[in-house]
From Swiss-Prot:
Coiled-coil annotated spans: none
GO CC list: cytosol
Name of this protein: Phosphoglucosamine mutase
Function as written in the Swiss-Prot or TrEMBL entry: Catalyzes the conversion of glucosamine-6-phosphate to glucosamine-1-phosphate.
Entry EC number(s): 5.4.2.10
Catalytic residues (UniProt): 102 (phosphoserine intermediate)
CDD domains: GlmM (cd05802)
Pfam families associated with the record: PGM_PMM_I, PGM_PMM_II, PGM_PMM_III, PGM_PMM_IV
Keywords recorded for this protein, A-Z: Isomerase, Magnesium, Metal-binding, Phosphoprotein
Length: 444
């Protein structure tokens, strides 16, 4: 695979106003993508965004670039990333484009592409777009320029799709649910889905102003949700991130229920109903307790690299339908082609209603081992993980943990950091072990 200049694991991302998230680059990116995608299909691209103020600027730039290449753009307005994956398929679009930086602050943004099938673009297509970016920009003749249109009922279409994944014989009419939409793309989706299925809904994080996305709310900061669940005596709390592809839950005691526990609940329910189709894909960061709990049920488990892209690739490799990350990306491939926070929450709620059990009771089968994560900054140059001294300390720690835990050492893909993770039933041993390895990395 060729070295990427612009595309990371989740498209093109960065700080707004700094290259490559500038109007001129995004214009060129739209043109390059248009040139590559215009070779076949409908000549139509779907564009959605989250609630960042910069989304207006970037969608205009994308539209101009696509039109210059001869492709038409249809805009959905603020819409969760998984909604764009779904709508790209139903509108038979050539591709879907999401303008979002997911769980990042408002001053970041990004451009992510979906194929006509609603999956991440194949590597060869991304490489072709990168190659086209190196060419001088031109413009098709006037009669062949692309047009722009707006899809006014996009939200309603996606709401109905989400509801269709919830069993028709079940209802949420006995549940009080707090929904935290991170002032992001699910603000007009998730509360309506839950209400239309019968729930009493209390909303937080549903007043986006362009700059408050993910700010002290959502899946990356659940304190406000925990407080609201306890204050209102709600049955459950749901937290999505800025673009709606992550879910973190809170039980009625205010306890966090993370992606590993959510994945287990959905896997166990799929096993009971005969819909599991194979095993479950986690990541290198998935808690060891998830692996052990699945093993007790006889459910196979494999680990992919961190990132929902790699989880999906591993799922496709094994032809399995369920995978996810502890951060809350949950992919249920027989329902949608990417991580979908709203659909994952409905899968857990269905299990609660079906068995008349609380979230706390459902999640209790996975007692998460303490995880200690230390980020060690290094000055660049040689990778400290290649050092014999660091390898020796890591081997020594692994022997001490011997079946009671595990270590994971990896270099960040975006910053000069070594991430040291130690997981163990004994929290004190995990802390000491992580500090020992981190010190070896610093001293290298």
């Amino acid at each position: 695979m060729a070295e990427r200049k612009y595309f990371g694991t989740d498209g093109v991302r960065g700080k707004v106003g700094s290259y490559p998230i500038t109007p001129d680059f995004v214009l060129k990116l739209g043109w390059a993508a248009g040139k590559v995608l215009a070779t076949q299909g409908t000549g139509k691209v779907l564009i959605g965004k989250d609630t960042r103020i910069s989304g207006y600027m970037l969608e205009s730039a994308l539209e101009a670039g696509l039109a210059a290449a001869g492709l038409s753009a249809a805009f959905t307005g603020p819409m969760p990333t998984p909604a764009i994956a779904y709508l790209t398929r139903t509108f038979r679009s050539e591709a879907g484009i999401v303008i979002s930086a997911s769980h990042n602050p408002f001053y970041d943004n990004g451009i992510k592409f979906f194929s006509a099938q609603g999956t991440k673009l194949p590597d060869d297509v991304e490489e072709a777009i990168e190659a086209m970016l190196e060419q001088p920009m031109d413009c098709v003749e006037s009669a062949k320029l692309g047009r722009a249109s707006r899809i006014n009922d996009a939200a309603g279409r996606y709401i109905e799709f989400c509801k269709s994944t919830f069993p028709a014989h079940l209802s949420l009419d006995k549940y009080k649910i707090v929904v935290d939409c991170a002032n992001g793309a699910t603000y007009h989706i998730a509360p309506n889905v839950m209400r239309e299925l019968g729930a009493e809904v209390i909303e937080i994080g549903t007043q986006p102003d362009g700059m408050n996305i993910n700010e002290n709310c959502g899946a990356t900061d659940i304190k406000a949700l925990q407080n609201q669940v306890l204050e209102t005596k709600a049955d459950i709390g749901l937290a999505y991130d800025g673009d709606g592809d992550r879910l973190i839950m809170v039980d009625h005691f205010g306890n966090k229920v993370d992606g590993d526990q959510i994945l287990f609940i959905i896997a166990r329910e799929a096993l009971r109903s005969g819909n599991l189709k194979g095993g479950v894909v986690g990541t290198l960061m998935s808690n060891m307790s998830l692996e052990l709990a699945l093993k007790q049920l006889g459910i196979p488990f494999v680990r992919a690299n961190v990132g929902d892209r790699y989880v999906l690739e591993k799922m496709q490799e094994y032809n399995w339908i369920l995978g996810g990350e502890n951060s809350g990306h949950i992919i249920i491939a027989d329902k949608n082609t990417t991580g979908d926070g709203v659909i994952a929450s409905l899968a857990v709620l269905a299990a609660m209603v079906q068995h008349k059990l609380s979230l706390n009771e459902l999640a209790s089968a996975v007692k998460l081992f303490p995880q200690v994560l230390i980020n060690v900054r290094f000055a660049g140059g040689a990778n400290p993980l290649e050092s014999d001294a660091v390898k020796a300390v890591a081997t020594e720690v692994e022997k001490q943990l011997a079946g009671k835990g595990r270590i994971l050492l990896r270099k960040s893909g975006t910053e000069p950091l070594i991430r040291v993770m130690v997981e163990c039933e004994d929290a004190e041993l995990a802390q000491l072990s992580a500090e020992k390895i981190a010190e070896a990395v610093r001293s290298n």
